[in-house]
């Protein structure tokens, strides 16, 4: 334990060997991505499981370079914001890398968002261009922004007051554009604005730099480098609009020279077919997918999954029985857990798969370069091993702050650079991190964040609702689902279905209320603060 816990400073560090992070200040995540790829130009970089299309590392660099030159011709400049509103495909990372190559900034948005949700994000970050697909055009066109349509002209007619271009046309330029354009990009420049609810409240733009992505990529693949493993083939059905899909899978794996199999939307048999067809070695999943792999034994065993070496789950803790059943269904794979946040560019800790399946509930050791303190939530002093407190973090992968929100930034990052996660956890004597509870009020539904405050605000906008509280409810498939306690006005005849429909029209499907209970009052403290934790305990005691 001496190696990872300093009793004098009360700071935890990683057992893993240190990583040499690049010190050149003039470095973009895109130039770092292709730093080594010249030595394996014909190696497969991206495979689209939906279309069968593939890109070698040479073709990937060529497409990124040509699109970057096209963006310059479309007058996209350093610090301009480009919104990607699209599902996973091999074109998604090409767009991200091209935008970053110019020093422009990518923001991403969940394709299931309503136009209101999309518009709210656009108002906050002020994009100059949107990249989308024909299926989402009816929402995207209402932003009245110039647009790029993925991937190519389709049979559907796209009406718009704004200009738009097709991705396939923009990447069909002359070979003289096959090198990245010269640009003045520094590691400290902003690369992405990914939206997160943080520790509480409405969605906020997390400001992530090129350095954040570069250092994260080295942390994520440090065990592969340490053990000298050859090229991995990684499945990516987790959304690339989310930090895990974009940073931990797409960017980090490609930067290491690993292959990535992209899938637009998760469907169990489709994913298993892709694993079998492309000999996928690494699966990155969230608990609902792990539960499917564990419980759908007949389906899972129908496919040849012998290539799978590792299944990594994040987003929420897994039960031991689920992990053990998954290990029985995919016997060649190490079943491990990891922990990350948007604010940490996706990585905090991860189990070492070479040490076998522990099934302990641990999220593993800290990634190299990250420090942690466990803070007593009453006295706010750091704690030694085996004592629970709020997890605080520091490292080169930590966000710069929240966009246009100095108050939230100051409440999350202290003067010494510690990022307060809002999660409760502890380290054991071996330096393994356990996440046991959340201070923050977020609901994790199918791995997505649902902010109770957002749904409560919508509920209170209804003329017949006087008060409301939204809390998580355990669900075997989703992990948690949002449910609501609602106080109706005296003469209201609102039904549960009325309230559910009212919310459903305004939010993405994963935010829908699964249950509404009418109550006479919402449980609050004398100061008027919702006693959310007590309410959660009360509801769960009745299960």
UniProtKB/Swiss-Prot annotation:
Its EC number is 6.2.1.-. The keyword Ligase applies. Residues 267-337 are annotated as: SBD1. Its main location: cytoplasm. It comes from the Eukaryota. The keyword Nucleotide-binding applies. Keywords: ATP-binding, Cytoplasm, Ligase, Nucleotide-binding. GO terms for molecular function: ATP binding; CoA-ligase activity. InterPro entries: AMP-bd_C, AMP-bd_C_sf, AMP-binding_CS, AMP-dep_synth/lig_dom, ANL_N_sf. It is found in: Cytoplasm, Cytosol. ATP binds at residues 196-204, 337-342, 423, 435-438, 529. Both substrate-binding domains (SBD1 and SBD2) are involved in the substrate recognition, and are sufficient to confer the substrate specificity. Belongs to the ATP-dependent AMP-binding enzyme family. This is Probable CoA ligase CCL10. It comes from Humulus lupulus. The lineage of its organism: Eukaryota, Viridiplantae, Streptophyta, Embryophyta, Tracheophyta. The gene is CCL10.
């Amino acid at each position: 334990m001496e190696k990872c816990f300093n009793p004098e400073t009360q700071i935890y560090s990683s057992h893993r060997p240190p990583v040499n992070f690049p010190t050149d200040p003039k470095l973009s995540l895109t130039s770092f991505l292709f730093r080594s790829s010249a030595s394996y130009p014909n190696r497969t970089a991206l495979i689209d499981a939906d279309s069968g299309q593939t890109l070698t590392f040479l073709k990937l660099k060529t497409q990124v370079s040509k699109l970057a030159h096209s963006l310059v011709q479309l007058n996209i400049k350093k610090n301009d914001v480009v919104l990607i509103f699209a599902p996973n495909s091999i074109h998604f990372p090409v767009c991200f890398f091209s935008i970053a190559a110019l020093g422009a900034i990518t923001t991403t948005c969940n394709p299931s968002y309503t136009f209101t949700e999309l518009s709210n994000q656009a108002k906050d970050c002020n994009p100059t261009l949107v990249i989308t697909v024909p299926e989402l055009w009816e929402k995207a066109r209402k932003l009245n922004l110039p647009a790029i349509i993925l991937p190519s002209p389709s049979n559907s007619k796209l009406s718009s007051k704004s200009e738009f271009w097709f991705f396939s046309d923009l990447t069909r330029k002359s070979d003289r554009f096959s090198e990245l354009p010269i640009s003045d990009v520094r590691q400290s420049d902003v690369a992405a604005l990914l939206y997160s609810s943080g520790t509480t409240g409405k969605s906020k733009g997390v400001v992530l730099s090129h350095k954040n992505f570069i250092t994260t990529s080295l942390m994520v693949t440090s065990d592969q480098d340490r053990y000298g493993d050859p090229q991995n083939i990684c499945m990516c059905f987790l959304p690339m609009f989310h930090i895990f899909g974009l940073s931990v899978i797409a960017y980090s794996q490609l930067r290491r020279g690993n292959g990535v199999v992209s899938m637009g939307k998760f469907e169990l048999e489709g994913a298993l077919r892709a694993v079998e067809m492309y000999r996928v070695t690494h699966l990155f999943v969230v608990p609902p997918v792990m539960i499917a792999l564990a419980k759908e034994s007949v389906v899972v065993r129908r496919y040849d999954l012998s290539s799978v070496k590792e299944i990594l789950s994040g987003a929420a803790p897994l039960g031991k029985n689920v992990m053990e059943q998954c290990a029985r269904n995919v016997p060649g794979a190490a079943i491990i857990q990891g922990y990350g946040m948007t604010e940490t560019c996706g990585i905090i800790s991860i189990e070492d798969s070479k040490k076998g399946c522990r099934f302990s509930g641990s999220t593993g050791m800290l990634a190299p370069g990250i420090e942690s303190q466990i803070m007593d939530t009453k006295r706010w002093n750091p704690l030694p091993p085996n004592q629970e407190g709020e997890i605080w973090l520091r490292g080169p992968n930590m966000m710069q702050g929240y966009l246009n929100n100095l108050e939230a930034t100051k409440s999350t990052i202290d003067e010494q650079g510690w990022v307060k996660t809002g999660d409760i956890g502890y380290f054991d004597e071996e330096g393994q991190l356990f996440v046991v509870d959340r201070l923050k009020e977020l609901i994790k539904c199918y791995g997505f964040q649902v902010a109770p405050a957002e749904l409560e605000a919508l509920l209170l906008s209804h003329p017949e609702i006087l008060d409301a509280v939204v809390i998580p409810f355990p669900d075997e498939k989703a992990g948690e689902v949002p449910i609501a306690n609602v106080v109706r006005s005296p003469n209201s005849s609102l039904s549960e279905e009325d309230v559910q429909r009212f919310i459903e029209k305004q939010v993405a499907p994963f935010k829908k209320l699964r249950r509404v209970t009418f109550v006479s009052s919402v449980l609050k403290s004398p100061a008027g603060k919702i006693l959310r934790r007590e309410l959660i305990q009360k509801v769960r005691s009745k299960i």
